[in-house]
Amino acid sequence: MAQREIPFLFMRGGTSRGPYFNAADLPSDRDAIAKILLQVVGAGHPLNIDGIGGGNAVTNKVAMLSRSADDAADIDYFFAQVSVLEQLVDFKPTCGNILSGVGPAAIEMGLMPAIDPLTEVRIKLVNTGALVVARVQTPGGVVHYDGDTAIDGVPGTAARIDLQFMDVVGAATGKLLPTGNLRDQFDDIEVTCMDVAMPTVCARADAFELSGYESVEELEANKDFMTKMETVRLAAGKAMGMGDVRKSVTPKFAVFAPAKAGGTIAARYFMPWQAHPTMAVTGAQCLASCAITPGSVADGLLTRPSANPATVTIEHPSGTIDVVVDYDVTNNGLDLRSAGLVRTARKLASGQLFVSS
């Protein structure tokens, strides 16, 4: 069978990596898109040997970009998470790390012009409907990748990209607390189910007899914990109104512990069948929001910041991530106006990908 070529950019976005496409170069039908992305990544093999995936959830991510018809946005960003081992593409979640590369990629693709010295890109997250403003370094009207900003989980430094997330509450379920409760209990594990940028089931590490400081390898080798966590996640997914989530990567899962390296709180985040080597951008917003919500499972593990906006520093397996949260505590929980983070991105390659026609 003949192969056909599809133009693409290959980029690191935050602590993730994957192909970025102009949506005009792909079919409009999601089933047809999924068939192409399975080939692109090489899904179905632990090393994704017949594609450009990296054998890990953080390297099997795809961004599809187009000019937005929404007056509030410049670019529509449609995300897909492609499974490593299964023939499965999930269009439900979004990815904040891959989002870090959307502004630069949109400019590189000619979807919007660059402005000297800084280009503000208003991005609509198609999967969730949220709006993000990305500020991209573009001196001389050209995307600048070199810089002095370091993020934990990525070697070296790169140009700073500021992300300001708006309208992130209830991104998937329409509610801050999808179950209607600050705390729920599933299979004897107490959790807080929260939907801020990414629906996430949060628990205390000690509820699973964990310290909360385990490495990725230690967590994934603990089969009893991974099985128990999935049991709790499935029950929580139903209670959150998300239905049967056995084949969905949402809701995500996280466990909290007291900070031990000068941060606000320590956490381990799951995608959900693998432990995240660092921390997801969308997940970090949800965890930061949960951490500062009185009465959540994180209550008692930290001293809540008194400033507003508040900087919440989350310790993860590779270091820390800072989330700046603009909020008010109300009788109903949290009134979250926006959340901001600093990320970096880098163009790794550009060219043509080949798939069966």
Model-derived segments and spans:
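A glycine-rich beta-to-alpha transition motif near the start of alpha/beta enzyme domains, typified by
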Residues: 1-357
